[in-house]
Amino acid sequence: MNIKLYIFALLSIFLMSSSTGADFYSSMTKVDYVEGSKTLKFTTKLNTEHISSAIKIRPETAGFEAEVKRYVNKNVDVYVNGSAKTLTFTGSQVNGESVWVYFEAKGVSEISQLKIRNSILLETYPKQFNVVNIAYKGQQKTMNFTRGRETNQVEF
């Protein structure tokens, strides 16, 4: 069932991006559970031009990383088993057309329910589509976020 959701998400992205004349905006986030440190590690890939427009600062400008950190903290919330988790920004990296953003939530021993609010770029780009892929103890889950559906949850 989970592989079907993942394939559907990828197919949806492909179909939406192949439409002629339509702008397409997306982000991808990978969430990995590290059992040894009881940490959820987030890696988010954003389009450089889109995030620069949203935070109104160019990546080569001093203070870009601080603005990205502030933006992520404002637009992402994580709840594990109903309890809010503090996200710690661990860095970002500009690589041409992509900005990679890294953050984590510590103190996660077991997950039966994971709820995420991801409104990254949804205010700036109404057609924005955010995909979050989660790996937890051998299980894979996928969440999709769009304007009007900024919050999603999965069960393990």
Language-model segment annotations:
Residues F8-S17:
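Bacterial N-terminal signal peptides
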Residues M1-F8:
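Bacterial N-terminal signal peptides that target proteins for export
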